[in-house]
Amino acid sequence: MEKMKILWVCNVPIPRIAADMNVNVPNICGWLTGFANSIEKLDNIELYIAFPQLGIKEIKAGTVGKIHYYAFSQPKLLGFLPVEDQVHESKYMREHLRTIISKVSPDLLHIFGTEYPHSLVASEEFNNPEKTVVNIQGLPSFYWMHFNNGIPYKELKRFTLSNIARGNLLQQAEKMKRRGMTEISTIKAVGHVIGRTDWDEACTKEINPRVQYHFCNESLRDSFYSGSWEYQNCEKHSIFMSQAATPIKGLHFMLRAMPEILKNYPDAHLYIAGNDLTKTDSLYGKLKISSFAKYIKRLISEYNLEEKVTFTGSLTEQKMKERFLKSNVFVSPSTIENSPNSLGEAMLLGVPCISSDVGGVKNMLVHNLEGYIYQADAPYMIAYYVKKVFIFGI
């Protein structure tokens, strides 16, 4: 029986591929691994995965298990800036994707995410809308409107040396808006989208009323389907956030909630996955600190939280799971999300969850039954629900 050939175009390699290529294993998009593992078990599908690699001039190809992979060129902006700062394609990128698509000759092109130029380039080079589907992740064409919610205007315009490369917070939102223009073109160029929330359906239908919308929940990382949170084993009065690198993740709201929490629970502690964005103990650290990180640093100082906030450093899948299970409560205070995977992972493990009422969160979590949802710009409600979890232990 002839196999169906599916070509994925992703923003990053799955960990197995990254390990095979001897490049850094990404801690994002881990849910792709579960999806790939499921497809790999099917005898009637041949899976190919293409993804960008910064600065390469030749296609890199290989195989892991039954999965074939190709790395194509992702240009360096100004010679060094990483992918998230890019809004333009490159000559190599288009040539590489054209070659990969021609070689694979896929029956279906499946694009994961719409936020980068390679998504549009792939859809254009394949040029078959009815056999092209886009998996909606975030939607920068809408995200940019919420990028700086809750940050004072003077902070938005504040200058740091890192602004020379990144721009200030207003400019970063504008950059996201420009990436959104590419996204709009991509969604208009395809015949199908896969989503999972009212929010992403509303957004994609606004962009392309003719696109066919298919509902499909995401597979999460394999390890989160086993194990269960237990109150007696958690660090009492500990709070966990899974990301905080950008304003969208809402750390500024969480920090504003901490003083009220500490009034009743002086031993409360906030753990944040990822490197310490406020660290300035070297000349390089002082030069690269962003204006958002400086704002966070000021909030920590203003509320005397220096001993109450810990950045865990980058966490592997297993370490992330361990951190979830140790936590008394998980909080997602984002200014916008579609369906945050971290919230899904916390819910799978049974960790008490609190989330801002943004994007598609209401399609994931039932308020007062599976956790608590609060008004996104109300840190006092974060404090209220955190204390409620601490009181009842669930």
Segments predicted by a language model, with ranges:
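Conserved donor-binding/catalytic core segment of Leloir-type glycosyltransferases
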Residues: L7, E230-K249, L255-E260, L270-A273
